[in-house]
């Protein structure tokens, strides 16, 4: 680009260096004849939209054209349509060599290859949880031919996460959808699947920071941050957020782009991370993402601790709540219950006398334990007599701490034929004895990997003591 010269007319708007990629994907790269002039390019490409400038790359010394040019449009959809219709065309009777047209790579991307069509056809949208794939298709089919739609769902419950993808057949159709759809969808260009950075991370960040750190984002185009915080004006931990509705879902915004792996590594510091997504906004060269936790307590803690966190050093990220349609009062009640349950479990576990108190009597024993979970549990069933032969033994691992014994008995008795639940003193593990193998298998299927009262359980078959005792003893 250093030796790109332009003889652009004085009547057109010439964007500055900082505006070359605003909006992103609005600049096309041309491979043309060395004899093709700017006026010919303007004649053939102006029907596609508002041309802001044309650059014909020339030799520094001879000033001859190198057969390469750039055309900057005002909108991404204009550039995409020009690429689709002009690639492989000839520009005149005296210019019989077909030209090549590509969407130019962003100057801040750190990559020297041109953008592929596949990267420009898939958009990411936020939708009501009631939306089906047909509803999504119906809303977005007006912008072009749709290859497929998908609604992201919870793998366990099958419930929509309020997120979806729409894939078009042409890049211009995806760009039209992003530019013209209702802003409530917060449509963004989705990250390519299995995208791999082509340059070392350090080089990538250094090049991006030179391009973006000195520029303030335009607040009205920053969809992931609340209107009060759109310009990263403050990162005070004591900001008043009384009007901000809490949820399990967070939006993350950064002046520096980030990958999904980097986003995960930051927010996985707080236990309970469910998933994270990275999105690309074609109008901004900034990092945008969505993070969701299994419980609201983790989300609240992550928002407080990570809002204003510097990653990479010198770049502060903005973290705010995203409305996921949940009832805030109900979420606060669940969070309070989880916190009390965790505090109670910690107190009981650190004091054996309290553990015995809860197990064998006391005022707490007369109350039915309250269980907070998304897991659908069967109703309570009677325990088997203590002298019943053990048919199956389960091993449980708790993270971050064990649940109280009364809660565990309430959970595991629901599968029937429960004999006993006991915890290993000083460890985050325990055992469950069943009088029937089917009941034990049902418990594993229902509870393994699930979160109850803020604690994740690993439930698996334990090694049988009888099998261990039958092993031949070593004689050496």
Curated annotation (Swiss-Prot):
GO terms for cellular component: cytoplasm; nucleus; ribonucleoprotein complex. The modification Phosphoserine is found at residues 199, 464. Residues 1-20 are annotated as: Disordered. Gene3D superfamilies: 3.30.70.330. Residues 1-14 have a biased composition (Gly residues). The keyword Nucleotide-binding does not apply. Expressed predominantly in fetal brain, in neurons but not glial cells. Mostly expressed in neuronal progenitor cells with reduced expression in differentiated cells. Less abundant in adult brain where expression is limited to cerebellum, olfactory bulb and hippocampus. Also found at lower levels in fetal and adult kidney, heart, lung and spleen. It is found in: Cytoplasm; Nucleus. There is a cross-link at residue 34 (Glycyl lysine isopeptide (Lys-Gly) (interchain with G-Cter in SUMO2)). One of its GO terms (molecular function) is RNA binding. It comes from the Eukaryota. RNA-binding protein with binding specificity for poly(C). May play an important role in neural development. This is RNA-binding protein 45. It comes from Rattus norvegicus (Rat).
